[in-house]
Amino acid sequence: MKTRQELTEVLDFIAEYATYLLGSGVHTSRVIRNSQRIGASQGVDLQLSSFQKSTIITAHDEESGEAITRVVKIPALPVSFERNSDLSAQSWDALDEGLPLSEIRKRYDELTAKPRIDPIFVLLTVGLANASFCRLFGGDWIAMGIVFTSTLVGFAAKQRMQAHGVNHFLIFIISAFMASLCASAALRFDCSAETALATSVLFLVPGVPLINGVIDIVEGHILIGCSRLINALLLIICIAIGLSATLLMVKDGLL
């Protein structure tokens, strides 16, 4: 049987753990399963209900009948599949090894304190990936080079604006505009300019919210699933606005 103080400590940690996963792009069912594993390792029954901006978590000690509920804000964090995988594995370790809360907290702090991938490396790999999309859709080597350069400009601008806390809808509009405007340089060369323009903004497509939204709806988490899909749709509209602004400026060159 746990005291109220012990139950509060377990709940506070799981609330931090769950919101970190939700903010990092993990779909809802996985967060619930991971959180309940950690709760089970501490002898606590856990119930979680998540929304777009916050989550409600209730911890219940069956022996004492004590129950505590928290409403916690979900932070906006960069997506890291490696970190999400490590945190999911931690929940299994907690259950299989019967770890005490102090050890679980220690391992969690170590995982979340690990340095992220260097932004320059991310910038270069995103540029190469987008250039590969250009090739996949029929672009030639000149168009690929232009798309690579355009992606570097657009993604670097996105990174800087995110660092300064600019509204994310505005970030997508400006990044799409800058990337497509740079890609419009393809109109001056004998290359597949239309493909270069169209693929220059693909690095902005919000794949994680789209996938998570569908998974959440399929698994019964309708509210957060719909909100994620709506948010992804708004971001796609922002991409279209930025690209449309460029097309209005260079429309004569496309004719």
Task: Please state what every model-predicted region is.
Residues 76-143, 231-240, 251:
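Alpha-helical transmembrane segments and their cytosolic membrane-interface
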Residues 107-111, 153-165, 211-224:
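C-terminal ends of transmembrane helices
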Residues 115-188:
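Core alpha-helical transmembrane segments of integral membrane proteins
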Residues 188-255:
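Generic detector of multi-pass transmembrane helix bundles and their immediately adjacent loops
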Residues 1-12, 113-114, 239-255:
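N-terminal charge/polar-biased segments
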Residues 1-99:
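Soluble N-terminal domains of membrane-associated systems
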